[in-house]
A protein has these predicted regions:
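Conserved active-site helix of classical SDR/Rossmann-fold NAD(P)-dependent CH-OH oxidoreductases
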Residues: 17, 107-110, 150-162, 171, ...
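Canonical Rossmann dinucleotide-binding motif of NAD(H)/NADP(H)-dependent dehydrogenases/reductases
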Residues: 1-25
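Conserved Rossmann-fold SDR core element
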Residues: 154, 164-181, 219-223
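Rossmann-fold cofactor-recognition segment
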Residues: 37-53
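Hydrophobic structural elements of the Rossmann-like NAD(P)H-binding subdomain
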Residues: 70, 126, 173-176, 186
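Catalytic loop of short-chain dehydrogenase/reductase
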Residues: 75-79, 83-99, 118-167
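C-terminal helical subdomain
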Residues: 175, 183, 187-233
Length: 233
């Protein structure tokens, strides 16, 4: 079973290490080769756009597609913007950047895959989402751009699952909320978080892989936690 991992952040790197330890074939695509990852398994991906993804998928032009594609790309803050606490702080540029980082990669990946898949292709496309993007679970507000972009991701994944069910019935699509992790994404907010709620990505990685290995076709289009339990949309 071959794996393609998008994003070299905390969980993406942890997944690469875990897969290597399991002896699995993998390609890790991202902006910088992480320490401890075999360069032979790395593909430089500087931009999140269709052209870059097409270049990435030239790796598979003469080989079978990966059985599992895991998209870990996501954006909560950058050097110019932090999550909004009030509606007056919502900025159209930041909202667009959040959508491009959190919702677009899933669709761009799906488009590249769809051009190469057949009705018999067996493949799972998994994108990391967040309970913050759930309408049903939103009880605190704030983080407008992040929440809206993750909600858009969830809708895109659900819509894609319906399309693939007709075009590629052996393939599946899910979004997974892995929970809070001790990664650079959450570093600015450590003072607001209880230490015991932060998970080590090295411990999350095997749980995510085990979940993906246990999925059934009926679960395509689901939004799940690491235990495989459905989360509210």
């Amino acid at each position: 079973m071959g794996y393609l991992i998008l994003g070299c952040g905390g969980l993406g790197t942890a997944l690469a290490h875990e897969l290597s330890a399991r002896g699995e074939e993998l390609v890790l695509a991202g902006r910088q080769l992480p320490k401890g990852v075999d360069p032979a398994c790395y593909f430089p991906l500087q931009e999140v756009d269709a052209l870059s993804f097409d270049a990435l998928f030239t790796l598979y032009d003469t080989a079978a597609l990966p059985s599992v594609v895991i998209n870990t790309i996501g954006l909560l803050h950058d050097i110019n913007f932090m999550p909004e606490r009030r509606v007056e702080e919502v900025n159209p540029r930041w909202l667009c950047d959040s959508l491009l980082a959190n919702a677009w990669p899933h669709l761009a990946l799906a488009a590249c895959l769809s051009r190469r898949m057949t009705p018999d292709t067996r493949l799972w496309l998994c994108t990391l989402s967040d309970l913050a993007g759930s309408l049903g679970a939103n009880e605190t507000g704030s983080r407008y751009s992040y929440r809206m972009s993750k909600a858009a991701l969830n809708m895109g994944a659900k819509t894609l699952a319906h399309e693939w069910r007709e075009r590629f019935p052996a393939a599946g699509v899910i979004t997974v909320h892995p929970g809070l992790m001790d990664t650079p994404m959450n570093q600015p907010f450590l003072h607001e978080l209880a230490t015991e709620t932060l998970q080590d990505p090295a411990l999350v990685a095997p749980r995510l892989l085990d979940l993906l290995n246990q999925l059934s076709p009926a679960q395509s289009g689901s939004f799940l936690d690491l235990q495989g339990q459905p989360l509210p949309w």
